[in-house]
């Protein structure tokens, strides 16, 4: 104690001295009389004094230091646990409900029971599994289509729907789909065959029926022709069922048909079975188990069993690699896809939109399109193709001995004898503008007797397209006939570009205005009737030198003259613009047709269009014409000729949505010529919605429209992303400004690209190019002094007016700048207020969080104390019950002891026994002992003790 006291005393002395120092130091400045001590020195002094005081307190009371450290650690731990990130709260998903109704023929496994689906799949021959997600809009849309297909096929196919989104189902755990819905089909143990076609009931049913019956039975020659003339490629297998119910290779061929459906969900390759050996010989099938791939224009193939193993995968791969596509279906899925882009890059494409029902027994319109495609690509006059065309036309023809293609025979040399030619008179333009002479040529088509179409040799007149081809070749060589200056007829022969059996003869001579006839040819090959050229001369004088009359225009002057089918046959090989033919179902993809120019309110959804990406143009078949074989052939022929009479289709916006009461006129494709060709100066702005620079010019053109009079000047604009224009009016950059002067539309001017588009620059540009003095009509003579003076006065007036307008604009700009400064000041003040309010909001939110935390702590403390009080009350109740039980047992023990004493006394004095009643009276119960009623039974432990003591075994003699 003395040691601790010594330390305490030493500490006290030192502290007193330190305190004295502090007081002296603190009082020094005060007593020094300085009026304004440095704030830095005073703050450092206060900090030093505070630290000294804390150290003295720690030396005097070390237990306080330990308590403070412990309290700080406790606060840090509390802050760590309270401010740490709370665990994520995950709300369990709601249990799934049935996706299909209870009356639906579709078995709905809405809990994702994939194992049960696999179990029932083994017991069915054909099963369709529909994997869906309940939230998926496409799954919901496909639900009715699946039910409709199931209602028609439920007696043959098992339809099972599986919820593959329920997180506790086996389907979600085992399957990882990237999209919904997904349709799988199983044919017994084969599968899955995924269906990726349109989610339409008819298409789904058609695909399911193909899976049910992947092979078509061909019992007769008529059905064989139906099979071979189809636009889809076909594979035939020959099997003899007479010797065996399942001939060798049949099951492999059957499985290969299922493999083709698995790899090509559209089912474009059809598989058929022939059992008649005579019918099989028509397609060069002799041995049972042989497989034949039919191709229309290339050589048909027989599966090479000696080279490739005869397996289902190899047969399917061989058929898909060597198939020949005549007409192809396109199925855009509606999302981002390169499907159309990849097909259009192959060349010009003919898109035919037809309403298609895949469940229909026959498709007459598709048969006509197939006939057009066969004729279009039949370049060599193949006999098999001709026989198939006759079958499509339902023309009776003698049966061929074999439908297999014959080996190509050597073409005979063309004889020198020519058939009767057909001729057309052509007037070439004058070779010089001052020349009064023309070169007149007679162009004839000469067909050799060894041509591919012997029937055309005996024709007295050639077809229109043969003459059109001759003119195409002639115009390419017309430069050689420009300088023929001779009164005699000079003839020359040149070969056709596309046919080795045709050549053309051109006989030309030079004539003056007075010549009215044409003499006979020196070689006597043909005779020419006298022709008057007066009207032709007048026409040539009006037209430009590059304008040449063409024969294809006559077709529209005389529509009753129909072209023969022979001119269309093999046209794909005689033109450089070969078409690929595609079909689209207008019931599903009519929106594409509308974007290509089809009317939206069409009564019959039939439409045809040709799209040529390379030429950046497309053409449409007149919607007023019915879609049939003849119109398609004419449409293709008009596109294929060198000088096509088809007009490029222009797509534009609806002009009715733009009101006329505007400063700037909105131009569309339909109103372009009406606006540009009006008798006013027109300034046209080219813009697009995606052009970022274009909106910045709106205020410039609005001010320009306000400055210039609307009765003599029009400011217009056109959205070139929504409106097509003729090529001569297209531009290669945006924004672009074109100016069309009044009465001189052919002298349109483009605004300089290197000049900024501002209001003064635009005004100078317009004034420069709209000057009436620059009109070519006013350049005939020199202007007079009076005219120049009037023009100068007029220009001075214009300049003064423009200067006044510029001053007004500058004043408006100054006002707007001042208003802008005021608005910016108000915005800055508003931003400061906003920041202040945000800080207040954050402070209130922190206080609210603290109050909520304190409330939660109080609530937790209240619940804890309530539980403790409930526990204490329960224990007190248990003690009370135990005390009452002990008191009862004590009372009975006393009675038992008294009874035992009485019995002991009774044994000692057997002669002087006292009745129990007297014994009880001699030993009264202690006061305060509870008395049991007569009917109260003894406790179980006491009664058992008495019974054991009263038994004869416990008695002692």
UniProtKB/Swiss-Prot annotation:
It comes from the Eukaryota. Residues 941-951 have a biased composition (Polar residues). Residues 32-44 have a biased composition (Low complexity). Disulfide bonds join 441-444, 691-694. It is found in: Endoplasmic reticulum membrane. Residues 91-213, 621-771 form the Thioredoxin domain. Pfam families: Thioredoxin (PF00085). GO terms for cellular component: endoplasmic reticulum membrane. Residues 1-13 have a biased composition (Gly residues). It is a single-pass membrane protein. CDD domains: PDI_a_EFP1_N, PDI_a_PDI_a'_C, PDI_b_family. Residues 785-889 form a coiled coil. InterPro entries: Thioredoxin-like_sf (IPR036249), Thioredoxin_dom-contain_11 (IPR052792), Thioredoxin_domain (IPR013766). Residues 1-47, 904-957 are annotated as: Disordered. Its main location: endoplasmic reticulum. The chain crosses the membrane at residues 64-84. Residues 904-925 have a biased composition (Basic and acidic residues). Keywords: Coiled coil, Disulfide bond, Endoplasmic reticulum, Membrane, Redox-active center, Repeat, Transmembrane, Transmembrane helix. Interacts with the cytoplasmic part of DUOX1 and DUOX2. Interacts with TPO and CYBA. May act as a redox regulator involved in DUOX proteins folding. The interaction with DUOX1 and DUOX2 suggest that it belongs to a multiprotein complex constituting the thyroid H(2)O(2) generating system. It is however not sufficient to assist DUOX1 and DUOX2 in H(2)O(2) generation. Belongs to the protein disulfide isomerase family. This is Thioredoxin domain-containing protein 11. The gene is TXNDC11.
